[in-house]
From Swiss-Prot:
The lineage of its organism: Bacteria, Pseudomonadati, Campylobacterota, Epsilonproteobacteria, Campylobacterales. One of the essential components for the initiation of protein synthesis. Protects formylmethionyl-tRNA from spontaneous hydrolysis and promotes its binding to the 30S ribosomal subunits. Also involved in the hydrolysis of GTP during the formation of the 70S ribosomal complex. Residues 439-443 are annotated as: G2. Residues 514-517 are annotated as: G4. The gene is infB. Residues 405-574 form the tr-type G domain. This is Translation initiation factor IF-2. Keywords: Cytoplasm, GTP-binding, Initiation factor, Nucleotide-binding, Protein biosynthesis.
Length: 906
């Protein structure tokens, strides 16, 4: 017979060697150490005993006399005798005398009290099969009711057959329930099927009064019946009793605990409680329930072969071969492995072989995904999860049914100071340019005018180089672009940039040649300059209209408007006002009393007060709509510019706005988009190549100026941020630690104080009294500006002060060596005449011979007429001795100089 060591059993069962040796000694096995071996059968008994505290029925310790298993047989139906069986007991307990009675096939057994037999109708019996272990009840489990176990000197276990006594048959006739023959043997329980679970407090007694002593009738001893392994189940598991009663259990003997003796029940409950406490202590000592610590099963014994490896239970992997897979753009190593049905180890191994050090949680780059796809023979296609969250695409997929003509949206673009806003003012008869600081536009403004009964929407963009993003947004949100060029100034850099934005957006373009009232105006020069960048005038055979105008006198304004309306008519601009609104955000800000405010232009549909809208990751319900003249309205139609109030945050300028049905819909979609953005930020792997590492080290060595930027509108904030990020060189840079739309707050001051040497830059915002006071207390500098030029100049000056000064050399004097004198223990003294500048003592000096620098040191001694001199001026003679140098010859030139620090600027 195969034998197995104690230590192998302990590992398999999840127990300690010491604990298992103790249990083995209790069972009487000859075990002394962890390498002691026992048979496979004994191993199964030992593990069952160590884990559940139970022993197989009929188990005898080595050297113990075998005990007979007592099998009870039911009496003939007419025999009014109660059969009592004694359990298999330990050697200390003498077995009770039993009597064997021949079995009859049609007998049924029923659990009931004496009172139930007389007073109630017979109930259908439920049969369960259990195994009755021969161990003490100290480790048995009680759920709904006590589990039947055989305990030392236990009394009250009885076999109840159908009673034939006269008192049981008075007034009632017991109906025999039908049974199916059970193919397996075991101990069965017959009890009444009950509709609801009955707890341990339920009376299960054999009489209606005081506890009755167990029956003293003798039964004959019979040969022990062979015991087959059966399934252990809870005999009081009422859930399993609620199904089909006739579930395959045959008519066999029935063993029940006689709970009429309360001492038995109480003793069982005490032992059960003790067992549970011990189990909890073991779990606590092991740091929680031991994984895999299950009762030892016979089928597990196969893995306990002596000298062999333990069987490893591995998760069965699918053998499905994947040839094509769709993965998100940002995918981790383990996610890719799952998609292609490979292990993480295989994926990491391939990348490791190519010199890529990755872990399972690292994100894969596009190149790495291509390499892996080729290696595993999988066709990989990437998908953008944001496509599912694209509310604009979902809006566009719905067909417009009631199309109507809409006003054109015109964007005015061009170089700074070329008269864009003044031209728009003339059209609107307003004075917007006067209100802008410095006379330059620093915001995107949208206005609507009427010409010949038709409305035209104008969008004004800044011309300053810092406002590139604003011009790009203006081109995207428009139908026609007007490029304003000053006739006296010609084509400038921002003019070319505006034309590039317009062409990129695929928008029609009209050239307005402004300032035609000036004598220096030269329209032909403009046409020739624009022709060089493929913008050919219509009268030169091109496709672009050139309209001469003057914002000062009003010359050509009507011609310009008619050209716009003609172009719009050719474009057949239409929209469906019956649909929900779709708009584009041209500017956003925070206004006191209103919160986040977005300036939008409706592209399609109608926007109403109360509509639920989404703008990128921002959402809200429209609370108010204000037109460009300040009037409030309830709704606005296509191509109408307006300011809306009611969003939860300041939206990004250039974002698309779409109205939806419910608040829940917009909120969930916005939150999902925000979550995606966060995940995208996290997708940037922290792994860095050697080149990246060098760049990071160099970046860390840069001196930085920490700044906090606060602006009145989102567009200006973006412009300032973009300009400041460009202010850097190999030594200094601007570190933007915080940015926001709105006024300077106390929290901004606190943040600046926490950041060393941080400066708060406010654009078109002013700090309040309390903020000023706190800034003064904490020593935080708050600088406010209304013109972007001034802000950038100040930051440049601050960065210049942080840069290391440039060391320049300034020559202070020259002296020619006329004669040399050698003095013992002193050195060589050069007799010189100062030919230029002033020679000073202790100044730096270099010896030049035939135009070549021979030595560089400093003047250690300067004398005139044997007296020490502090300096010798041009034309005078003197004696000079250089420090640590004596090889001076006649004709040499001694030149003195000093280092001068010069502050640099960006």
């Amino acid at each position: 017979m195969d034998k197995v060591k104690i230590q192998e059993i302990a590992e398999e069962a999840g127990l300690s060697n010491g604990e298992l040796i103790e249990k083995a000694k209790e069972l009487g096995f000859n075990v002394k150490a962890a390498n002691s071996a026992i048979s496979m059968d004994d191993a199964g008994i030992l593990v069952d005993f160590a884990i559940s505290g139970t022993l197989p029925k009929g188990f005898k310790k080595p050297g113990e006399k075998p005990k007979l298993k007592v099998v009870k047989k039911k009496t003939v139906e007419k025999e009014p005798e109660t059969i009592v069986e004694a359990p298999v007991i330990e050697k200390e307990t003498a077995p009770e005398k039993t009597e064997v009675i021949p079995e009859e096939t049609e007998n049924t057994v029923e659990e009931s009290t004496a009172a139930e037999t007389v007073e109630s109708e017979p109930e259908t019996a439920v049969i369960e099969e259990i195994e009755t272990p021969a161990e003490t009840a100290k480790e048995e489990t009680v759920e709904a009711a006590p589990v039947v176990k055989e305990v030392k000197q236990r009394k009250g276990i009885s076999v109840v057959s159908k009673k034939a006594e006269s008192e049981a048959e008075k007034g009632t006739e017991i109906e025999k329930p039908k049974r199916r023959t059970l193919s397996r043997t075991g101990i069965k329980i017959v009890r009444k099927a009950k509709p609801a679970p009955v707890r341990a407090a339920t009376r299960i007694s054999m009489g209606s009064g005081a506890p009755t002593p167990p029956s003293k009738k003798k039964v004959k001893k019979g040969p022990a019946e062979a015991r087959e392994t059966g399934k252990k189940i809870d005999i009081f598991n009422h859930d399993s009793m609620s199904g089909d009663i006739d579930s395959g259990f045959g008519e066999e003997e029935v063993v029940l605990l006689d709970f009429s003796d309360k001492n038995i029940y109480e003793d069982m409950m005490r032992q059960e409680q003790k067992r549970r406490e011990e189990a909890k202590k073991r779990e606590a000592a092991n740091g929680g329930p031991a994984k895999g610590r299950q009762p030892f099963r016979p089928q597990q014994r196969r893995s306990l072969k002596r000298g062999g490896k333990r069987k490893k239970y591995t998760k069965e992997e699918s053998s499905e071969v994947i040839t094509s897979v769709e993965i998100p753009e940002n995918v981790r190593v383990y996610e890719f492995a799952e998609k292609v049905n490979r292990s993480v180890g295989e994926v990491v191994k391939v990348l490791f072989a190519l010199g890529m050090m990755v872990t399972k949680n690292d994100f894969l780059s596009k190149d790495e995904i291509e390499i892996l796809a080729e290696e595993f023979g999988v066709e990989v296609s990437t998908m953008n999860p944001l496509d599912e969250l694209d509310y604009v695409q979902a809006y566009d997929e719905v067909e417009d049914t009631h199309l109507e003509e809409r006003p054109p949206v015109i964007t005015i673009m061009g170089h700074v100071d070329h008269g864009k806003t003044s031209l728009l003012d003339k059209i609107r008869s307003a004075k917007v340019a006067d209100k802008e600081a410095g006379g330059i536009t620093q915001h995107v403004g949208a206005y609507q005018v009427e010409k010949n009964g038709k409305k035209i929407t104008f969008v004004d963009t800044p011309g300053h180089e810092a406002f590139t993003e604003m011009r790009a947004r203006g081109a995207q949100a428009t139908d026609i672009v007007i490029i304003v060029v000053a006739a006296d100034d010609g084509v400038m850099p921002q003019t070319k940039e505006a034309i590039a934005h317009t062409k990129a957006a695929g928008v029609p373009m009209i050239i307005a040649m402004n300032k035609m009232d000036k004598e220096s105006a030269n329209p032909d020069n403009i046409k020739s300059q624009l022709a060089e960048i493929d913008v050919m005038a219509a009268d030169w055979g091109g496709e672009y209209e050139f309209v001469p105008v003057s914002a000062h006198t009003g010359l050509g304004i009507d011609d310009l408007l008619e050209t716009i309306l003609l172009q719009a008519e050719m474009m057949e601009l239409k929209a469906d006002p019956t649909r929900k609104a779709k708009a584009v955000v041209v500017e956003s800000s925070v206004e006191k009393g209103f919160g986040p405010v977005a300036n939008v232009i409706i592209k399609n549909g109608t926007l109403h007060v109360g509509d639920n809208v989404i703008v990128g990751t921002t959402y809200g319900r429209i609370k108010a709509i204000k037109l460009d003249d300040g009037s409030a309205v309830k709704e606005i139609g296509p191509s109408t510019p307006a300011a809306i109030v009611g969003l939860n945050e300041v939206p990004g300028a250039g974002e698309a706005l779409v109205a939806m049905d419910t608040d829940k819909e917009v909120r969930e979609l916005a939150e999902k988009r925000a979550e995606y953005d966060r995940a995208k930020q996290l997708s940037k792997s922290t792994k860095a190549s050697l080149d990246d590492l060098s760049a990071l080290i160099a970046e860390g060595q840069l001196k930085s100026l920490p700044v906090i930027i606060k602006a009145d509108v989102q567009g200006s904030l973006e412009a300032i941020k973009g300009s400041l990020e460009k202010l850097r060189n190999e030594e200094v840079k601007v570190n933007i630690i915080h940015e926001g739309v709105g006024g300077v707050t106390e929290s901004d001051v606190t943040l600046a104080d926490a950041s060393e040497h941080a400066v708060i830059l406010g654009f078109n915002v002013r700090p309040t009294g309390s903020v000023k006071k706190k800034a003064k207390e904490l020593g935080v500098e708050v600088r406010t500006y209304t013109i972007i030029y001034d802000l950038l100049d100040d930051v440049k000056a601050l960065l210049g002060g942080m840069m290391s000064p440039v060391i320049k050399e300034e020559v202070t004097g020259q002296a020619e060596v006329r004669e040399t004198f050698v003095v013992g223990k002193v050195g060589t003294i050069a007799g010189c005449k100062v030919s230029d500048g002033v020679i000073t003592r202790n100044s730096k000096a270099r010896l030049i011979r035939d135009g070549v620098v021979v030595y560089e040191s400093k003047i250690s001694s300067l004398k005139r007429f044997n007296e020490d001199a502090r300096e010798v001026k041009n034309g005078y003679e003197c004696g000079i001795m250089l420090e640590n140098f004596n090889d001076i010859k006649e004709g040499d030139v001694i030149e003195t100089f000093k280092d001068v620090e010069e502050q640099v600027t960006l």
